[in-house]
A protein has these predicted regions:
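Glycine-rich phosphate-binding loop and adjacent beta-alpha segment
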Residues: 35-99, 135-138
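Short, surface-exposed connector motifs at secondary-structure boundaries
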Residues: 19-25, 45-48, 99-102
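Short catalytic-loop micro-motif centered on adjacent basic/acidic residues
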Residues: 26-29, 51-52, 78-80, 104-107
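Adenosine-nucleotide cofactor-binding segment
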Residues: 1-39
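C-terminal hydrophobic helical "lid"/dimerization subdomain
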Residues: 86-138
């Protein structure tokens, strides 16, 4: 499992996907949501699945959405929504983390004054792990 390719959305994303997979891909994880949903269907192969799990595009709904028309034949639409966990669920998660000594991989630490540099490192995707910004001011 995993990704064979990483593509940048440069306004030619669907064309680039179809150049690598002419029949389309089996699954699309849509993080921008309704804003790009119809376009994302174009990247799917027959019987492919589009999963919407975010609204990072800022558009929460699709006006005049008609599933009969807007979901192409032989393609599937599903979603994933993560609601606010209960205190009990959070306690369970933290017990698991502590019990199994799970620790994040920290690539670099920066002071608040170095936040510009931290942002550049994050944007360049050259580090494996978390970029941590520490506020030493009190």
């Amino acid at each position: 499992y995993g990704a064979s390719y990483a593509l940048i959305d440069d306004d030619n994303l669907i064309t680039n996907i179809l150049s690598l997979a002419p029949e389309g891909v089996s699954k699309v994880l849509e993080l921008l949501g309704p804003l790009t949903m119809k376009e994302s269907f174009k990247a799917l192969q027959k019987h492919g699945t589009l999963c919407i799990t975010g609204i990072l595009g800022g558009q929460e709904t699709i006006e005049k959405f008609d599933p009969i028309i807007d979901i192409p034949n032989d393609k599937y639409l599903t979603s994933f929504y993560s609601n606010y966990p209960t205190q009990e669920k959070m306690n369970e998660i933290f017990r698991y983390i502590y019990k199994n000594d799970i620790r994040p991989i920290i690539a670099d630490k920066y002071s608040l004054e170095e936040i510009g540099k931290a942002h550049s490192v994050t944007e360049n995707n050259k580090k494996l792990g978390k970029i941590v910004v520490i506020n030493n001011k009190e």
